[in-house]
A protein has these predicted regions:
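Active-site-adjacent structural elements in enzyme catalytic cores
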Residues: 1-186
């Protein structure tokens, strides 16, 4: 059974910290950021599973870090670079897919919507996660947006990367996993 309580305030699962060793270690970033934790307890480590794709050599310790359970059904790619270069690349790729008849989506933010206006095929679903100056708005929309793309039958999603500062680290952690670690620098 799945219980849906509607929109949530934060949109991210909790931060998980392992305190069983001398130096506490963040196992999963969340709305309580690395910086907040460091300000309170001092030295804090970071599980290397957060920083890169799990391999046979190491596996994540935290629940929710082992699987792509929030991944959309679509092929999702994240593009990293300047806003203009990322938008140009996404516009080109999204239009190519849409012109071939594939349901296509774009994930952006309020500040970048103007980069896409009148340049994308009218059938492309463009979603802003929120305001870059208010990362909690982005965190709040993550999973709803991915599910909305699923409901629409989207086959390809092209998204922007975000700053990994403060809560942005948790946002990019979730998006990176959802994209199967498919991040392209432009």
């Amino acid at each position: 059974m799945i219980i849906d309580g509607g929109m949530v305030g934060m949109g991210l699962e909790s931060t998980i910290i392992d305190v069983t060793s001398k130096t506490p270690m963040i196992l999963r970033p969340g709305f309580i950021t690395y910086e907040m934790i460091k300000d309170v307890i001092g030295e804090v480590g970071v599980d290397k599973a957060i920083l890169s794709k799990p391999t046979a050599d190491f596996k994540p310790k935290a629940p929710g870090m082992k699987y792509r359970h929030y991944a959309p059904e679509a092929d999702y790619s994240i593009y990293r670079g300047t806003a203009e270069k990322v938008a140009d690349k996404i516009i080109m790729l999204a239009n190519e897919k849409a012109d071939k008849g594939f349901k296509t989506g774009v994930i952006t933010v309020d500040q970048h919507l103007n980069l896409y206006q009148r340049k994308l095929n009218k059938d492309i679903m463009v979603v802003s996660l929120g305001n870059l100056d208010k990362p909690e708005t982005i965190a709040n929309m993550l999973f709803k947006t991915l599910r909305d793309f699923d409901k629409a039958g989207t086959k390809f999603i092209f998204g922007e990367a975000f700053s990994q500062h403060n809560v942005g680290w948790a946002i990019m952690n979730r998006l990176t996993k959802a994209a199967g670690y498919n991040i392209i620098d432009v």
